[in-house]
């Protein structure tokens, strides 16, 4: 028995069950700029057991200290980060259901968004399969990431391949909203 909710406030009681006070303090600007977190709640215990952060704006360079990679988002794009499900619930299709909840959240609160970028480490086969097979995502770009401490992240300069896309200085190579890196424009997906 689960329910899902979109959270726009770092003081939400369910979000506080999953995140440290330090991270919630760091992420106040994330929420102020329109970001949200989609939470999975186990109803019998009223406990948060899954989360998915949705970045809806292009972060500033100083946001690296908040754990936000420097992604260049167009007006019709967002970035899915920090998808996590408690190990006790991973076999119950909670992450799959959250994909549909993401769609419902975007339809309701962000109708202008057309594309959702995700992120998975190359060696994280489970996340990559989830993104490709269930969410219908495909690889558009590879980067090398550097992490310092608990939160600070950045992209190793020059590691973006190909040189156009969300992690490149110029963002995606097409401004019309229909053509995405890694896919033909024919509509065959």
Predicted regions and their residues:
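Core beta-strand residues in small-molecule sensory/regulatory alpha/beta domains
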Residues: 39-43
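Active-site rim helix/loop that mediates acceptor-substrate recognition in acyltransferases
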Residues: 17-37
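Conserved acyl-donor/pantetheine-binding loop and adjacent beta-alpha core of acyl/acetyltransferases
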Residues: 28-29, 33, 45-78, 82
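Conserved N-terminal entry element of GNAT/NAT acetyltransferase domains
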Residues: 1-17
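C-terminal "cap" of GNAT-fold acetyltransferases
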Residues: 145-189
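Conserved acetyl-CoA-binding loop-helix of GNAT-fold acetyltransferases
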Residues: 79-85, 91-107, 133
